[in-house]
Amino acid sequence: MKRLSHLTRTGEARMVDVSAKPVLLREAIAIGEIRLQPATLKLIESNAIAKGNVLATARLAGILAAKKTGELIPLCHPLPITHCEVSFEIPARRDRVVITASAKIAAQTGVEMEALTAVTIAALTIYDMCKAVDKTMVISDVRLLKKTKLAR
């Protein structure tokens, strides 16, 4: 079994040293969803949630979270991401919001934690803004869709 890179041989947590790795262009795409009542979606779409524009706020929260990932996850490297995008899709069933986030960087380590954090915080923001009208919401299926690295 492969040894985890963030643990020492004695099992202590450490930040991985990436200084010898080459700087590469890297991108990650993550996805997740929040299930909610169709009536809640109508309120979101008509901008009738008391706390304000839900999707605009969730988009900004996701982007901000991606930028702060290194402060939130103890062994995650603080990265100067060069691009982050958060988008939303409402499927025909109208019982969920699908959240997709992409992040890009030119660095010595990947940017997947930033994309995953963006999706998660966007979903939590939707939850927070809608919890007064919907007690059934469920955040689920947050996962990495794609991770790429290209030579500069």
Identify the residue ranges that each predicted region occupies:
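C-terminal binding/interaction regions
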Residues: M1-L55, L60-R152
